[in-house]
Curated annotation (Swiss-Prot):
EC category name: transferase
Record: residues binding Mg(2+): N108
Family to which this protein belongs: Belongs to the phosphofructokinase type A (PFKA) family. PPi-dependent PFK group II subfamily. Clade 'B2' sub-subfamily.
SUPFAM superfamilies in alphabetical order: Phosphofructokinase
Subunit structure: Homodimer.
One Pfam family this sequence matches: PFK
Pathway in which the depicted protein is active: Carbohydrate degradation; glycolysis; D-glyceraldehyde 3-phosphate and glycerone phosphate from D-glucose: step 3/4
Protein name: Pyrophosphate--fructose 6-phosphate 1-phosphotransferase
Entry's pH dependence statement: Optimum pH is 7.2 for the forward reaction and 8.6 for the revesre reaction.
GO molecular function: 6-phosphofructokinase activity; diphosphate-fructose-6-phosphate 1-phosphotransferase activity; metal ion binding
Record keywords: Cytoplasm, Glycolysis, Kinase, Magnesium, Metal-binding, Transferase
Organism this protein belongs to: Rhodospirillum rubrum (strain ATCC 11170 / ATH 1.1.1 / DSM 467 / LMG 4362 / NCIMB 8255 / S1)
CC cofactor: Mg(2+)
Amino acid sequence: MFKGKVVVAQGGGPTAVINQSMVGAVLESRKFRNVELVYGAVHGVRGIVDEHFLDLTQETTHNLEMVAETPSSALGSTREKPDLKYCQEIFKVLKAHEIGYFFYIGGNDSSDTVRIVSEEAAKADYGLRCIHIPKTIDNDLVVNDHTPGFPSAARFVAQAFSGVNLDNQALPGVYIGVVMGRHAGFLTAASALGKKFQDDGPHLIYLPERTFDVDTFVSDVKEVYDRTGRCIVAVSEGIHDASGEPIITKLAEEVERDAHGNVQLSGTGALADLLVSVVKKKSGIKRVRGDTLGYLQRSFVGCVSDVDQREAREVGEKAVQYAMWGQTNGSVTIHRTGFYSVDYQLTPLLDVAGKTRTMPDSFIAANGHDVTTDFLMYLRPLLGRGMPDAYRLRDNRVAKVLNR
């Protein structure tokens, strides 16, 4: 444990609980006498380079607690990935401000950022403790049982499809909902948690872990529609064909990519529009509608899992404890124990950074377009208390008089 200042930053997509992790790290840091000041970097590593800091030592505990319960990233975020030159600029600022502890809250790309900064600090012989705090609605961080942000987003998806199912029952047709998830289908699969009755939707769930064939998709939709008179489909934005090419790229001549080289899958309704058009054209079904859940999944106010909030706070607190009491850098990871409880560990950055976790085969039905009971058992405890329920009128039909 050495004297110094703390910097906390948030990276990647906002979530409903990322502020819990930030506040957890800030309040825990303020408990240690060796911590001189606690800074928040505005817009992630870009804020460090620009020396855009907020002094969170001066922030009241009450206001921090209010911010903790507020969705999205209170410090602002970034998608930037530091290279060597970028890291050298980071070190220049960190040294000038005498910062000794760096906590970065984020997902895959953010964990890789922490790894790079950590390695460059070691090369420069600069005493900097670097801890990655997990966050991603995609739930695709390796080693972790699940990641903060995912349970609340999953709760939103489950409730959204529950509502869509009720709407679709009243006015039957085909509904296609596109859900976030580039490589991992956890969030799309969460749509199944909104089902209560046997004929509830989603009736079909398509995940990036399985190859997507357009003709097979249309055939599946038509089979369900012919059998039930309606069909609700949950589709991951990351679905791809047999060659590995994302279906979305078939729509555009130029595909936009972010700073990490990732194809921009979100922020457009193109995939939903494509699938709607294909189903209409090849199946002959007239009433086909599509939606893209988009950014609503990430930080929807009023749809937060209490389990997610608690664990997001705790990974922030544990990050500080590991930094103060330990001698190594790393990533805080979540491990399930028993039916449902969790334990936290500090995992080497190399074991987490830049790696992607996908849904295991045991979570995906043999037919490739549904989930298993194992997945439902895995996810249900994460959604938290107070999930809304839906009911139906009993089918007490009155006999016809005119027999028409």
